[in-house]
Design a protein with these regions (language model features):
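Active-site SXXK
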Residues: 172, 189-215, 235, 291-295, ...
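Short, charged, amphipathic alpha-helices and their helix-cap/turn boundaries
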Residues: 144, 149-155, 173-178, 251-277, ...
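Active-site helix/loop module of the DD-peptidase/beta-lactamase fold
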Residues: 208-242, 270-273, 300-337, 341
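Active-site Gly/Thr loop motif
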Residues: 320-324, 371-427
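Structured C-terminal helix/loop/strand segments within mature extracytoplasmic catalytic/sensor domains
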Residues: 29-42, 55, 63, 410-452
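Active-site-proximal alpha-helical segments within enzyme catalytic domains
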Residues: 200, 287-296, 335-359, 416-432
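Beta-lactamase-like hydrolase cores
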Residues: 130-171
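Conserved catalytic neighborhood of penicillin-recognizing serine enzymes
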Residues: 223-252, 257-279, 286-289, 341-344
Length: 452
């Protein structure tokens, strides 16, 4: 009888399951992909929708359009917005995830038993009434440059680039800014990986304060093997050699870190080595997550104190008055991806770099740090990445061939840019939601030509 039941199980359940799995495999989907797909899709959907609605203040229709551009698969999910609780539920075939908003620190996925975010507080200071960059006032607009920039933004969007903000700073003053309909100088824009460049600066501030050295190794007690030889500088250069891939297919390390684990740092600390540290560059949001973990550990005794300290002693002197820096469920500031700010505030990051680490009368990092941050890394495969900043010419193939060799930038998904041209005392900010590659070299070369 038991043997017959086993045969029936095989015939009616196992065999069809194997056939379905084989059919998906023919289409290129592995069992690991299929197993993780519902969790990853609903996690991404809930997180994006929550932040779009309650951080960026988009309506449901705009959020739905942006989510579809990010991935058409996410448009297949069902979304429920609870405006009273500021929570979003995303569901797919019976599988659902929720993300919740919290005052001052935005949205993140909910995980049972993880309440660390509820202990965090981002101190809200009274806005400084002063001219940019100390405050928010702009009275230095050049009418000619303003018209040129507005024309460029309109042309971008005629071409389908979905540019939402362009801003130009020349010699320390905002001389032009243009916004797409529905966006203003007070709109918050997600910088995606531009947050990585800010993480690099936070490490620099800790070095200036004597709280770390970039040559340090033995960084975390969980690393009692070959990983103990990884240095802070290798994390900054993304040459740490950890077995992490910036691939967002379900089952890969990137979505697992961001959308399937409550503590991004704990997940990264569990990964083994793949390469010898310092030898090979591999783009890694995980490296930046570990840097943020280190920042909070070296800043204060707990996450709540660290977040308040960074708000008071890093972002406030920088002059970033309208921003949201999201954390994961374990209370870690997600410096790999999730910092929202106005175009004027993003420009302050570029101006800080242009000023050699000083802004608004306060030194944030040393001038030596800025110089080292903009040096090519020593990897054997890709050297145009400094301390979380992209460099124009570290190889024979410039990133922006029409611009000087010493140009550098913060870059983010959907073609976000804060680009600095030191030779012309220029900072250029581009923010949007591009579905494909943006014409940044063409536009930035044109903008630079206006100031020659």
């Amino acid at each position: 009888m038991k043997r017959m039941l086993r045969w029936l199980l095989a015939i009616f359940i196992v065999v069809p399951l194997l056939l379905v799995t084989a059919a998906w495999a023919v289409l290129g989907y592995s069992p690991v992909y299929l197993y993780n797909a519902p969790s990853v899709a609903t996690g991404i959907g809930a997180k994006l929708a929550c932040s779009m609605r309650y951080v960026m203040a988009q309506n449901e229709q705009q959020a739905a359009a942006d989510i579809k551009i990010y991935s058409p698969i996410l448009a297949l999910l069902d979304y429920h917005y609870d405006d009273e609780q500021r929570r979003v539920r995303a569901s797919l075939a019976g599988y659902e995830r929720t993300a919740s908003w919290q005052e001052g620190i935005g949205c993140y996925l909910d995980y049972a038993g993880f309440t660390e975010r509820q202990r965090l507080h981002w101190p809200q200071a009274e806005a400084v009434v002063a001219d940019w960059p100390q405050g928010y006032n702009v009275s230095s607009i050049d009418p000619v440059k303003q018209q040129q920039l507005a024309t460029m933004l309109a042309e971008d969007n005629t071409l389908g680039h979905d540019t939402r903000a362009l801003l130009v700073v020349h010699k320390g003053q905002v001389v032009a800014e243009a916004y797409a309909p529905g966006y203003t100088e007070r709109s918050l824009f997600l910088g995606w990986s531009m947050a990585k460049s800010i993480t690099g600066l936070m490490i620099g501030q800790l070095e200036m304060q004597g709280k770390l050295e970039v040559t340090e190794t033995g960084l975390f007690p969980q690393w009692q093997d070959g990983r103990s030889s990884i240095s802070i500088e290798q994390l900054l250069h993304m040459t740490d050699g950890l077995a992490y891939d910036e691939i967002y297919d379900p089952g890969a390390t990137a979505p697992a870190m961001l959308f399937q684990h409550p503590s991004a740092a704990a997940y990264m600390l569990s990964l083994p080595l793949r390469d010898e540290p310092g030898r090979h560059y591999r783009y890694s949001s995980g490296s930046t997550v570990l840097l943020n973990h280190l920042v909070q550990q070296r800043t204060a005794a707990n996450n709540a104190a660290a977040v308040e300290h960074l708000a008071e002693h890093f972002f406030r002197p920088l002059g970033m008055q309208r921003m949201v820096y999201e954390t994961d469920a374990a209370g870690l500031l997600m410096g790999s991806s999730y910092l929202y700010a106005t175009a004027r505030d993003w420009a302050k990051v570029g101006q800080l770099m242009l000023n050699g680490g000083e802004i608004n009368g306060t030194r944030i990092v040393t001038e030596d740090w800025i110089q080292r941050a903009l040096q090519p890394n020593g990897s054997d495969n890709k050297r145009d990445f400094g301390y979380q900043w992209w460099l124009n010419k570290a190889t024979d193939k410039p990133r922006w061939p029409g611009l000087p060799d010493n140009v550098f930038a913060a870059q983010g998904n959907r073609e976000q840019r804060v680009l600095v041209i030191p030779d012309q005392d220029l900072v250029i900010v581009r923010l949007g939601w591009s579905p494909g590659k943006y014409r940044d070299n063409e536009n930035f070369v044109e903008i630079a030509s206006w100031f020659r």
